[in-house]
Amino acid sequence: MVSKLWKNYDATSAYDGYFTEDNKLRKHATIISSILERHGKKKLQEIEKNCQSTISSRGINFRVYAANNRAEEKKWPLDIIPRIIPKTQWNKVSKGLKQRVTALNLFIDDVYNQKKIFKDNVIPKEIIFKSPYYVKECEGFSPKYKAWSNISGVDLIRNKSGEYLVLEDNLRVPSGVSYMLENRMVMRDVFPELFTRYKVAEIHQYTNKLYNCMVECIPKKKANPHMVVLTPGIYLSLIHI
């Protein structure tokens, strides 16, 4: 039976993370549904207001550019009602993403070195060599572990049957990682009940893992390596001040 909170909700137009096509609540959404129902519209509006206030006070913005190249800063949008991915689903997606990024790194390494992909006629070489992003100076070079892409931003979508599909791969230093970390901190502050009722996967070790990844990719081992992250700072389309 669908509660009053959802009685006018239509979940048939596309895949819905909370409801099946026949408007039955999915198992992993029962807890969040009861939380939302208990709080009611007024309380949820208070949480939303608190969320926006926290975002403003923390200076979480993003920059958009108009047709005249004039930049405008906007507040970062954050939905207080989360997308819930069950652990079994995420484990499968995570495994697939690791496999995909490994394949992409091997592809890049092959393009700059053995070029088997052209010899086997998998892809026309003109597509690669005419690309403005092809760096001829990298020919014959292979980074440690063949890790050309240290950070990969893979955009995922779900089709109507719930299958995960890749919309695009962002390998050229994708932005947005700090937003992920800030989203989590803001949500813990404004909606802590979600984290007591669900066993949410932790992400606070991300920066340490990124550092360790960069250290591992240094060609020669050093006790205290110096690493530099190049960034245009506030001139990025996404900024976090």
Question: Which ranges hold each PLM region?
Answer:
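Preference for protein termini
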Residues: 1-239
